[in-house]
Amino acid sequence: EFTHEEMPNRVRMTTSCCQINCGGQGDIAINVQYVKPPKINHDLVANVCERPAVVARCPVAAIRPAMVNGKPSLEVDEKKCICCGACYPPCPPMQINGPDSTKLAIWVGGKHSNARSKPTFHKLVAANLPNNPPRWPEVADIVKRILHAYKEDGRAWERLGEWIERIGWPRFFEMTDLAFTRHQIDDWRGARSSLNAS
């Protein structure tokens, strides 16, 4: 359906295994979203993980050292855990990935280059989508809606994020028929200049 370059500009799609998104900023990013804290294999933690590094890696201080069955291990405070997945790379026995603990999220409008406008971070447009491999029909449907709207309304050489900035986020959600929820509100204190306020 979108095999020929008939779009206003090239669309860069990225995927990432977590919301940390080391894949970078893409026009459309499909990221795994974890919904449950990691399950810890206490038998392997002492031999595989550098525990102080794992504790330091957690952005919300939800991981602490512990002794389990007489072996050094780790424990997770499930009330603090934000399920970001930052603990898994330095400690594979802290398995966070699984069919019952992952969903998908779609972010749009990211850009690394400074051509025509400054580099931008992408923004969340759909969250908690079911992880239904191998075709991911719910994700494919939303990506197609975004691409159709962009193809119809985008100007020549205008990147996806530039198109959204031109038409505005409310119009983008109307054109793509996506639900705007509280998760899309940019309420970070340092982002006051980007808030949609009068």
Q: Where are each of the predicted segments found?
A:
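Peripheral terminal and linker regions in Fe-S/redox and tRNA-modifying enzymes
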Residues: 1-198
